[in-house]
Amino acid sequence: MSDGDTIKVLADGNKVVKIRLHGIDAPEKKQAFGRVAKNTLSSKIAGKIINIVPTGKDRYKRELAKIYLDNEDINRYLVRNGYAWAFVKYSKDYIFDENYARAHKLGLWQDISPTPPWDFRKAKKKHKIK
């Protein structure tokens, strides 16, 4: 696992493929809940056979996909349990699940005002430029 929304899988022909989970954005590793999100994803799927449903490529040409373990949408699981945001800029698939996690104060929603990863990245980028 690279982080809570990116995985590396061994595909046919023993080729390692990096996949960005479609429709979600997990906290960055150095953010609050970043390591928890990564560890949750890892404990859920590491070493298991998953079903990958490609959805396209992102602006960085990374493969995007929904991943399933025994018919469970893992992307949805991460959002619904408060380990990731619904990435509504690119997909509306998981809005209901984010609202559920917020209402029940699950995972990162235990924090009064969690910082979305896109704001964290933007602030980090600004800081590097100066």
Positions of PLM-derived features:
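Small beta-barrel nucleic-acid-binding modules, primarily SNase/OB-fold domains
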Residues: M1-K130
